[in-house]
């Protein structure tokens, strides 16, 4: 099992980071998982829709999640994840490795978005039709390829080591399974094994039990 590594400026943080997001998993959960993996204490502020409506006009970017850390305010979930990845040794060791990680993360975001596009449809009949397409076409398209990646990368998604792509995979698989009300990894044994291993990582295991 990989051990979390805290490096760089996190060793010298004077104030506790603050993550602001809604009281749900969504795009905030990959960040929470990375902070848990790094054993970084932070304020997990779950903002209400009413509070957010009053707050967002005064921000540099009206987007959540938002991470306040080391006197800086970070927006955009994947930018925040990349920032944390560099601090926690969850990034690539070369430009090419970084690019491979980015490609996988982009694919995971596309996967999540395609499932979410069905889940949030207001019309029930249309939603069921779209769900059938997601189950028959979208799941195999992404899961088959991700299964091959794990087989070819020493049990990880990319570059043969734990990266933030794996943490995002864990978060999104949980979210996608929830939206589909289905255990989606049963036909992909390597992904299923990887998923279970990620859930047992130090920090992450205890976070998932909260």
Question: Language-model segments: what does each one mean?
Answer:
Residues 101, 157-184, 192:
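GST superfamily/GST-like fold recognition
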Residues 104-109, 192-205:
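Short, mixed-charge aromatic SLiMs
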